[in-house]
């Protein structure tokens, strides 16, 4: 048995240890191809030579605009070994937003594939600092591998641009120590061993997919099976879990919800091998967990977790195969105790809050970021000199130190002095037949200055009958009023895909509010609580 690499201080060392111990062992499987640790090491050296030929040197930033593919790993590790800095980007972020990341990161080059080249070049026009657009054929050279500098734990490993749920993405600077220490305590909290088999469809440009699924398995020698994140049919995910006898997988809540809604025939799906299915990156719903476990005959399978990019992902993970814990109101699930080495406190305007009191969650851990790249003002807003990170999330700790997430500070809707959590409204609306997905936002009235509740609901394709849509609007208003005591001031029924989301599936509520007030929804509205849009 190869030794674990959890004591590695850099990602280069972590993977290098695995290469030395078992070069022929599979690191990951993707698109019916297996990449071993030895192959990764050889190809990353080759890609490093291609990057050096293009003028990339130690400290340079290179944006990675890739789908889930082996070339992503070859480029990423090649850059790490050179002492250069990878900057993974959401491939379909949009021309202006991508150009903003190109400029903000001071990237010297972009590594991509032909599928995305046109969009990359459109964004390149808005970033004069960008000198090269490189594809695999530009990097797969026969030059001798360059001399690799010594990489230390304090060096920048990569820059992870945040999802941007409340504004433009910011570059989270993570050191090698941030990543390797987080990977170590994540593997421990999730009780992962080399006997586990991991399946992931999460994107590699997001922290949950990259750090949680791509870097954690090699720390303990577990094989990884990858799927593309744009799965049209969720059955493909569960069929792969069944086929390879996976023991561990992870998804935001909407992924499990998608399986419940869109997999009719469950024959051929057998999840008994799964020891744990983590749920995170968005509010975890007990109703989703119960529906999934009932439909697929699983018990104590889905476990909540909590983290954020600014903390190198992991903060708390619920123990596997342990009954879930609800708060006394029955509304909120615990995401577990903080991981080893992670401290959590709850603060209000009065200071640190006692057990059971809701406030803003702050975190201190070896994973807390170095700061936002080239943005000291934004860094000071969230990161204190004492190392405490303000997360912007709301929650509380119970008397045993278990963490509960209740919402997000900036998302709270204040109606007649009462705080309303958007996720509470969305859970009610999402269970109404005919609704595909929903979002609740508070929009300030120009006349009174007070917030008014707006509900936007995506309706299933083919739902175009005005009478049925009118009935659906009334049903939404009645159920929200019955469940939360407030009537929506306006309900907008829209076409599928209208509600803006981040790369990890979080609702961009501030963006949605701007779309409503700026009258940007236009023809995507199929019915509104003021009348029908033809």
Spans of features found by a protein language model:
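Conserved C-terminal "lid"/linker of ANL adenylate-forming enzymes
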Residues: 413, 439-444, 454-455, 477-533
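AMP-binding/adenylate-forming catalytic core of the ANL superfamily
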Residues: 110, 249, 365, 370-371, ...
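Conserved pre-ATP/AMP-binding loop-to-beta segment of ANL
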Residues: 23, 143-161, 167-168, 178, ...
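Structural core segment of the AMP-binding/adenylate-forming
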Residues: 53-54, 81-149, 252-253, 258, ...
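Gly/Ser/Thr-rich phosphate-binding loop
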Residues: 238, 246-251, 260-330, 343, ...
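Conserved ANL (AMP-binding/adenylate-forming) active-site segment centered on the GW(Y/F)…HTG consensus within
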Residues: 327-332, 368-392, 409-410, 426
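Conserved AMP-binding/adenylation subdomain of ANL enzymes
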Residues: 180-197, 207-247, 262-266
């Amino acid at each position: 048995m190869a030794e674990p690499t959890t004591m590695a201080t850099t990602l280069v060392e972590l993977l290098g240890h695995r290469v030395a111990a078992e070069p022929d062992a599979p690191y990951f499987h993707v698109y019916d191809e297996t990449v071993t640790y030895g192959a990764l090491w050889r190809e990353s050296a080759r890609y490093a030579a291609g990057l050096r030929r293009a003028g990339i040197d130690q400290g340079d930033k290179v944006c990675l605009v890739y789908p889930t593919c082996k070339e992503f790993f070859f480029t990423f590790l090649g850059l790490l070994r050179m002492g250069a800095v990878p900057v993974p980007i959401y491939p379909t972020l949009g021309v202006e937003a991508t150009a903003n990341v190109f400029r903000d990161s001071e990237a010297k080059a972009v590594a991509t594939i032909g599928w995305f080249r046109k969009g990359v070049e459109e964004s390149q026009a808005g970033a004069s600092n960008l000198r090269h657009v490189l594809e695999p054929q530009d990097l797969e050279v026969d030059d001798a591998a360059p001399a690799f500098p010594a990489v230390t734990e304090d060096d920048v490993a990569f820059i992870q641009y945040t999802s941007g749920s409340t504004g433009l993405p910011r570059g989270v600077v993570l050191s090698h120590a941030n990543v390797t220490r987080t990977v170590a305590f994540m593997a421990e909290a999730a009780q992962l061993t080399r006997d586990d088999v991991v399946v992931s469809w999460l994107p590699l440009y997001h922290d949950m997919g990259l750090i949680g699924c791509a870097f954690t398995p090699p720390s303990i020698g577990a094989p990884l099976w990858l799927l593309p994140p744009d799965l049209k049919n969720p059955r493909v995910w569960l069929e792969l879990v069944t086929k390879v006898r996976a023991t561990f997988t992870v998804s935001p809540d909407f992924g499990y919800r998608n399986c419940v809604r869109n997999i009719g025939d469950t024959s051929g799906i057998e999840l008994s091998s799964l020891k744990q299915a983590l749920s995170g990156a968005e509010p975890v719903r007990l109703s989703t967990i119960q529906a999934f476990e009932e439909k697929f005959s699983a018990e104590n399978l889905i476990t909540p977790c909590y983290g954020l990019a600014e903390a190198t992902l992991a903060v708390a993970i619920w123990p596997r195969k342990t009954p879930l814990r609800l708060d006394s109101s029955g509304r909120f699930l615990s995401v577990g105790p903080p991981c080893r080495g992670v401290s959590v406190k709850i603060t209000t305007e009065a200071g640190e809050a006692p057990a059971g009191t809701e406030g803003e969650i702050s975190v201190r851990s070896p994973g807390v970021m170095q700061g936002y790249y080239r943005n000291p003002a934004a860094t000071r807003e969230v990161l204190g000199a004492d190392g405490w990170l303000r997360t912007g999330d709301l929650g509380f700790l119970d008397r045993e130190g278990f963490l509960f997430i209740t919402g997000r500070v900036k998302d709270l809707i204040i109606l007649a002095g009462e705080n309303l959590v958007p996720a509470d409204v969305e859970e009610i609306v999402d269970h109404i037949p005919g609704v595909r997905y929903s979002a609740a936002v508070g929009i300030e009235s120009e006349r009174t200055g007070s917030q008014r509740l707006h509900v936007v609901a995506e309706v299933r394709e083919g739902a175009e009958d005005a009478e049925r849509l009118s009935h659906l609007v009334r049903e939404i208003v009645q159920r929200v009023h019955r469940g939360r005591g407030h009537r929506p001031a306006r309900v907008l029924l829209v076409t599928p895909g209208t509600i803006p989301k981040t790369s990890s599936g979080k609702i961009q509520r501030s963006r949605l509010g701007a779309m409503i007030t700026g009258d940007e929804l236009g023809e995507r509205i199929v019915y509104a609580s003021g009348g029908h849009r033809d």
